[in-house]
Amino acid sequence: MSNLETPEKLPSQVIFENLKELLRAKNTAHESMFKFHWKKMWPFRLFWPQVDFERIVRLMSEIRKNAINQKNLVLQAKSKAKPFEKTFLDAVPAYLDALDVSCQKLSAAAQWKQDMLYKRIHKEVKLRRDVAEWSNILKEYEDAQGNLVRAGAIVQIGWSEVVQGLNG
């Protein structure tokens, strides 16, 4: 087998790969909380373990830490960047901020669900107040998701410029 040298990746390519991984992890947590699955229905939920909300809270914390590291990487990459990477690298910090807020809100939703499980075990549920609180948490998460999608569109525009620069 011959050893083919792989060209060194541009900083924007590394950052883009990292963003995909962060978003994949966040989306997995989102789906485990909100996506319909037959195992979540009665009586199946009595047999299969349910969503581990505490794990989601920890994962969101890790993603937020990684987002901060990515911001630092973007600052370093801007000094080495080629002109066609500029739009992408300028858009990434706003996207990481939106990802951070979205992770905070998803973490808050997971923590609320975990607290509700604890209250249900100890018979402390006050349904009317708890439903209003949950509704507010979901509304905040929905707003954060909307901001994340809008910031992601700008990142995609910047990434298309990077791809054109690489192919051009």
Regions found by a protein language model. Give the residues of each.
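Cytosolic juxtamembrane helix and N-cap/initiation of the first transmembrane helix
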Residues: M1-E31
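Extended amphipathic alpha-helical interaction segments
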Residues: A77-A110
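Polar/charged, Q/E/K-enriched amphipathic alpha-helical segments with strong coiled-coil propensity
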Residues: S107-A132
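Short, charge/polar-rich alpha-helical segments
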Residues: K9-K20, F53-V57, K86-L99
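Short acidic DE-rich linear segments
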Residues: S2, E161-G168
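Alpha-helical segments in soluble extracytoplasmic regions
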Residues: R24-T87, E124-W159
